[in-house]
Every structure is written in C-alpha cells, then in structure tokens.
C-alpha cells in the first residue's frame, strides 16, 4: 500500500521539483488532496473536502439543470476564470422535467464556477501556510485531476498562489499516451 499522493508524485513531478519544493494538488471528484515535497521527500499532506463534484453541484443548482447535464456542461464548456470566457459564446442548458432548454453565455457559467475554484485554492493556500513550507516551494504548484484541466484553472491558481502553476501529466510513459496523459 502506498499513499496516493506519493504514487501520483512519481508520475507527474520531476526530481528537481521534489528536491526544490513543490505542492501537488490533486483535484478529485469528492476531495482535493495536497502533498508538499522538499529535499526529495514528502513533508506534508492534507485533504480538502471541496472538489469537482461541488463544482458540478453548483452548476446544477445555479442553472437549474439535472446533475448529469451539469457534469457534461462542466467538462465541455466551463471556465474557471470569468474574464477568459466569452460573453458572446452561448451554450444550451437542458431544463428540469418538462422545462425546455435555454441559452446561457459561457461567461455566466464561468461566474458560477469561479467562486468555487477561488474558495478551493484559498483553502489550499491556507493549508500550505499551515504546513510551514510556503516559502520553500521553488517548484510552485502542480495540479492534477480531471477538474484541473478546465480552462482558466492555471491562470486563477497563479493569481491566488502568486507562484508558478502547471498541469501535471504522466512523464516517461510509452504507448497509449493520449489515454494516460489526462492528469
């Protein structure tokens, strides 16, 4: 048995990042897992009970659409930073029950999504500060997980963390790379 954050780190972090100091943030469905590495070793772990499922629920509630459609809308159209989403781009939002679909701008969708990511990254920042390793993360932040792939996530994270942020993808994997490349 191996700690999930440690296993993920071997797939997506470089040796230099682990040595210089890096925070791995894995945004899952139900939780966001944090692992801080310095001097080549894991030094701190944490779990935040906010993740992709909460973003989906926010979309379902705000747009008054069933959860399965909210998940599809999140994956296909959502943007974590409203200023990057086009107000002129519209999406169809299915209604609940007998209610018909309606049009909504991508920017309006982003205005639902951005506050949840802001909250999540603010909680991650608080956990980093609590760990005492905030000043030794020369490698910055590496985001993984399906919800980390959303447009605007890196830009919003950089605004909040004030350090470099990148999306982590498995390195050194041969064959079927497109399948395993998703963080």
Residue ranges and their predicted role:
Residues 45-47:
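Residue-level detector of high-confidence beta-strand sites
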Residues 182-183:
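A contiguous, mid-protein "functional segment" used to position or interact
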Residues 24-31, 37-40, 51-52, 145-150:
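A short acidic Gly-Thr/Ser loop motif
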Residues 1-24, 41-42, 52, 63-115, ...:
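Nucleotide/phosphate-binding catalytic cleft detector across ATP-hydrolyzing
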Residues 139-145, 153:
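Helical hairpin unit composed of two closely spaced alpha helices linked by a short loop
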Residues 120, 127:
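Conserved phosphate-binding loops in N-terminal lobes of ATP-dependent enzymes
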């Amino acid at each position: 048995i191996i700690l999930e954050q440690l296993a993920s780190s071997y797939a997506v972090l470089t040796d230099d990042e682990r040595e210089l100091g890096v925070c791995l943030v894995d945004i899952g469905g139900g939780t966001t897992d944090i692992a801080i590495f310095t001097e080549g070793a894991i030094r701190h772990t944490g779990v935040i009970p906010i993740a992709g499922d909460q973003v989906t629920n926010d979309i379902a509630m705000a747009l008054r659409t069933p959860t399965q459609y909210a998940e599809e809308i999140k994956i296909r159209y959502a943007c974590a930073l409203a200023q990057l989403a086009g107000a002129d781009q519209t999406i169809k939002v299915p209604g609940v029950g007998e209610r018909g679909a309606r049009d909504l701008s991508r920017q309006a969708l982003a205005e639902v999504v951005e506050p949840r990511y802001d909250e999540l990254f603010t909680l991650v920042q608080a956990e980093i500060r609590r760990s005492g390793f905030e000043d030794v993360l020369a490698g910055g932040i590496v985001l993984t997980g399906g919800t980390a792939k959303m447009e605007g996530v890196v830009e919003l994270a950089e605004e909040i963390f004030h350090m470099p942020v990148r999306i982590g993808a498995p390195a050194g994997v041969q064959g079927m790379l497109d399948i395993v490349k998703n963080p």
